Amino acid sequence: MGIKGLTKLLADNAPSCMKEQKFESYFGRKIAVDASMSIYQFLIVVGRTGTEMLTNEAGEVTSHLQGMFNRTIRLLEAGIKPVYVFDGKPPELKRQELAKRYSKRADATADLTGAIEAGNKEDIEKYSKRTVKVTKQHNDDCKRLLRLMGVPVVEATSEAEAQCAALCKSGKVYGVASEDMDSLTFGAPKFLRHLMDPSSRKIPVMEFEVAKILEELQLTMDQFIDLCILSGCDYCDSIRGIGGQTALKLIRQHGSIETILENLNKERYQIPEEWPYNEARKLFKEPDVITDEEQLDIKWTSPDEEGIVQFLVNENGFNIDRVTKAIEKIKTAKNKSSQGRLESFFKPVANSSVPAKRKEIPESTTKGAANKKTKGAGGRKKK
């Protein structure tokens, strides 16, 4: 879920914190990518029609591999250096949110069965996407593929968004690419939405800068975290009737959740009986992340050509000619990106960003939309 309504809240109250950037403007940049979010997108979009999905000869789904392979090559060809960060064990506080998601998938599965029996193609398409879940096997497959491609992988101890933010705060990467707005709540200095969208969608990258958020909202980082908790996050329920705009007003007026609770009209607003906002706050401020330099050995290496062919072609039925051409693209891209950003050697490049247009910013583009098929390296349909 991320932070409920945060995109609109920022568009209305802190518009200068958001800038549309060209995909190509990140040439030479190291970017931490929320891997699970990307894999979820691939499973929903790549080669999928209704309940049909790309599979190998054994009937195992390969949409995530095709999506990860093609999208990563696109990043590399643009001179971008991705670092994929995978989720570890979720915090205990997230159990309730995960239970809600499980329940929604179960409901969607029942609805999908009804849609199939009725032959309603539109509902089949809709409900089949709601049943998608990223599994350990999907993650393991993508980790193996990325390592074969010479792209660094970080396995977070807990939340991937928190680890991405930590990499950004420590200067190891330029920004964080995800669709979950709680990357900002974890304090990522620069947060990028739509970087992992397919080029066919032609949507500019939306770059958020946390320093400008705080400046425009006139909040401290602690107050911004409280604002996000009040708006609605993955770690605890929100107070019914308090949305983002009301939460901002209350934080500006009272400064913290504790003071808000002391002054809140209890007849108008019902506070949850067990509301672990303080624990949620601690998770945002002091997340469980890897800081050991040895565990964060982030290096981009040459692709293992034989390994890629073995994994994609021999084990997963991808087309050998397409995979071979893709490997050449990786090698060419690696040489290109080794040049580094031009401004490191010459004068700074002019900023190509343009002001954000609020009407073009959907609150959630990930878990729904893109219905276009993506042509890729291989696979076959599975019903």
Curated annotation (Swiss-Prot):
Cofactor list: Mg(2+)
Binding residues for Mg(2+) 1: D34, D87, E159, E161
N-domain: annotated segments: 1-105
Region annotated Disordered, chain positions: 337-383
Biological process, per Gene Ontology: base-excision repair; DNA replication, removal of RNA primer
Segments of this protein annotated with the region I-domain: 123-254
Subcellular location, principal: nucleus
The record's account of how the chain is modified after translation: Phosphorylated. Phosphorylation upon DNA damage induces relocalization to the nuclear plasma.
SMART domains reported for this sequence: 53EXOc, HhH2, XPGI, XPGN
Disulfide feature: none
Enzyme class: hydrolase
Record-given protein name: Flap endonuclease 1
Organism whose genome encodes this protein: Arabidopsis thaliana
Lineage: Eukaryota, Viridiplantae, Streptophyta, Embryophyta, Tracheophyta
Gene transcribed to yield this protein: FEN1
